[in-house]
Amino acid sequence: FGYGHRYVECLQDFYKLCGKTPLLPRYTFGNWWSRYHKYTETEYKELVERFEKEEVPFSVAVVDMDWHLVEDVPPVYGSGWTGYTWNKKFFPNPPEFMDWLHKHGYKITLNVHPADGVRAYEEAYPRVAEKMGIDPASKEPVLFDMTDPKFIETYFEELHHPMEEEGVDFWWLDWQQGTVTKVPGLDPLWMLNHYHYLDNKWKGTRPLTFSRYAGPGSHRYPVGFSGDTVITWESLQFQPYFTANASNIGYG
């Protein structure tokens, strides 16, 4: 309200106050392939080869949540919404698969819903539990808690870094579990965006995360996505308008 129709000046002052949007890696400006589908390694490779044959350029391979165990999670542990263990029925050799994608010019992002923490069926559970001071034999879950520095350290060092060393370039944070933490007013999505962006620098490359809007200041942790949509022409027509309007608070 203080700027009238001086929109550009308003945004310039907003950036001065809240920080500028960091430069993105060059590959992010290419086409991304993303489909909610239970891909197998073979099917994904066939798709990439078809893109190459048809001369359809892509720079990012997105693998949605079925890269990890979902339906095969024992019922005692709840749903398979959260997961960090590759589904070897679909991807029998994850490092080889990601190396193949890299050789074909793709960067790789995996979808994660981290809210359920780490449960005893996960391959990483023993080392995560030990680091958190939990006896692995107890099968006690490691609860997700972005207010706990020890959990944050373990979360990155034991869950994400090993898979990044195998080939994951950045993470698609698909947080949908609310805004409440042990600290009043602290949004877990804000913490996830902040720490994932900072942590993505560890390999010496230009950092990137792929996540939802977590409030003013989210432009400092690019890049964002709209959230779930419906498959209709009306929805597709709305998306450019919706995306362009996000720039009113620097987000994109």
Go through the PLM ranges and name each one.
Residues 1-252:
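Catalytic-domain carbohydrate-binding cleft regions of carbohydrate-active enzymes
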